[in-house]
Amino acid sequence: MASRLLHRLRHALASDGPGEAAAGPEAEQFPESSELEDDDAEGLSSRLSGTLSFTSAEDDPDDEDEDDEAGLDSPPSGDGASGEDAERSPPPDGQRSSQLLARQLQDFWKKSRNTLVPQRLLFEVTSANVVKDPPSKYVLYTLAVMGPGPPDRQPAQISRRYSDFERLHRNLQRQFRGPMSAISFPRKRLRRNFTAETIARRSRAFEQFLGHLQAVPELRQAPDLQDFFVLPELRRAQSLTCTGLYREALALWANAWQLQTQLGTPSGPDRPLLTLAGLAVCHQELEDPGEARACSEKALQLLGDKRPHPFLAPFLEAHVRLSWRLGLDKRQSEAQLQALQEAGLTSTPPPSLKELLIKEVLD
C-alpha cells in the first residue's frame, strides 16, 4: 500500500513539472487526492498508529502488514520499476521532491510510533496447551510479556485460561463502561473450543485484548488488570516458598518482580516488598547471600523514610545479618533497627522475612 502511495505521489509531482501532459478526463473524474483522503489515508493512519484489528488471517495476513511497513521504512528503488513506470518517471527535480516526501513520510511514521503509540507492553501467545483435569478440560495460554529493555532479556511470562480473561473483561466492563465499550473480546463457543483454528484465533484475540487495555491509561492502572498479571504468580511463589521448594519459588518471584517492573504502575502497596522478601528468602536458602542482601537493600530503598512499615524491621534485620556475613558495612541498618526497637515499634528480635511470607494473605 505504501509503495502504491509513493507511486501516485511521484506522478502527482511529475504532473506539475514542465513538459508533462495535462490530466485526462478520467483523472479529473477520479482525482488521486480524493483516493488518498478517502481510502489510503485512513489505512495509512491506522498502520502508523499501530491500531490492532480482530480480522482473521485470511482477511489481513501478517505478511502484508510487514510488507507495508517495510515500504514506509525503505522507499522502493528505481531498479525494480517496470517499463511503464520508467516512461512516466519524473524529471530530476521531481525525483528529489519525491525522495523528500518519502523521507517526510518516514519521519512521520517514526514520530507516530513515539507519540500516537507510547511505549507499552507487547504480548505474544507462545504456547497453548489443552489441559485435561477431570471432570474439566480447558486450554492454557502462555503469553510472553515484553517491555522496553535489552533485547536479550528473557521476557516475563504468564499462563492463563479463557475463564481468567473472561473474568478480567467482565470486571473491567462493570467498572469502566466507556473505555471498555470500544474493546472487543472473543465470545464463548458451545462447540469446537479445542480445534486448532479456535485456539489460534483466540490467541490472537487475547494478544490484542491485552494490548488495547495497556493503551488506555485509565485501564492500564486498574487494580483488576494488575491482579490479572501479578496475583496468581505471587500466590504460587508464596506456596512454593512455604513448602521449602526454594529453587522453583525463586523463578516465580523473579518473574513476578519483572512483571511489576514492566507494568510500571503499583500492583498494590505491599506487593513489591513482598516480592523482594520472597527473593531474599530464596536466595538466602540457596546459599546466595550477595543476592539476598541486594534484595534487602532494594526493599529498604523502596521503604525510604516513610512511617514504620511491617516489613521495615525484618528487612533491616536481614540486611544487618547478611552484611555481617559478607563483611560489609552494617552500621546504618543496625542503628535504624535499634531505634525502632527502643521506640517499641518492633519486637526484639523482629520477625523474619520468612515468617512474614507465611503469614501474609494475598487477596
Swiss-Prot record:
Domain annotation PX: ranges = 119-236
Q: Where is the composition biased (Basic residues)?
A: 1-11
Q: Which SUPFAM superfamilies match?
A: PX domain, TPR-like
Chain segments carrying region Disordered: 1-99
Q: Which UniProt keywords apply?
A: Cytoplasmic vesicle, Endosome, Lipid-binding, Membrane, Protein transport, Transport
**Where primarily located?**
membrane
Compartment(s) where it occurs, according to its Swiss-Prot or TrEMBL record: Cytoplasmic vesicle membrane; Early endosome membrane
Named from the GO MF annotations, one term is: phosphatidylinositol-4,5-bisphosphate binding
Compositional bias, Polar residues, is annotated for: 46-56
Write out the GO biological process terms.
protein transport
Sorted alphabetically, which Gene3D superfamilies does this protein's record hold?
Phox-like domain
Family per UniProt? Belongs to the sorting nexin family.
Name of protein: Sorting nexin-21
